[in-house]
């Protein structure tokens, strides 16, 4: 019986670890040029679909299912461990949000009673901004809420409407991350409304406030 309980705990921990590694792995490997069909007409779906071909995974799978059926999906990753996807597509705003809530019914845990519901949230934002050159700045931000701590990743690409390519913009990422002291646990919230970025700031007194990173016309 103890062996079965141990295996169940290991499976859950591995599940959270794998999820956290999604953001961590992307943070290490995002700087790739991505081919997109050249066009003066840009949509968030077009940019995200091209990005998703380079970086497939559960977020992309959920979005593709949403496009086909009008809803995302709920899957049982392990026994009593569910992952529920939701998609917010706002074409006029140039914005996509894909979120999951991992729900686990606790069996054995020092911090939970048997039968308690444990929820871990994960989220992906995608958005784009118009640049003075006519090109677009495309952003991806990911937060994976792990068992112990969150793993976050941020990426920016410049979309050349004439060449049809998403080229990584590491300097833009560097500028934004410098504001949050390069903290890999800070989730940068891309805008559904407006152009500015936001993030949660935790001060030493335990107060939580939203801070803004202003859009400056060509970047942040």
What positions do the PLM features span?
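Sec-dependent N-terminal signal peptides
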Residues: 4-13
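Sec/Tat signal peptide C-region and signal peptidase I cleavage site
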Residues: 16-20
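Terminal domain-start segments
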Residues: 21-127
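Surface-exposed loop/turn elements that mediate protein-protein interactions on large endomembrane-trafficking
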Residues: 96-114, 158-170, 215-219
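Short, surface-exposed coil-to-beta transition loops
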Residues: 119-124, 138, 142, 149-154, ...
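Structural signature of eukaryotic scaffold interfaces centered on beta-propeller domains
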Residues: 124-133, 185-193
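Short aromatic loop motif centered on NTY/YTY
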Residues: 165-220
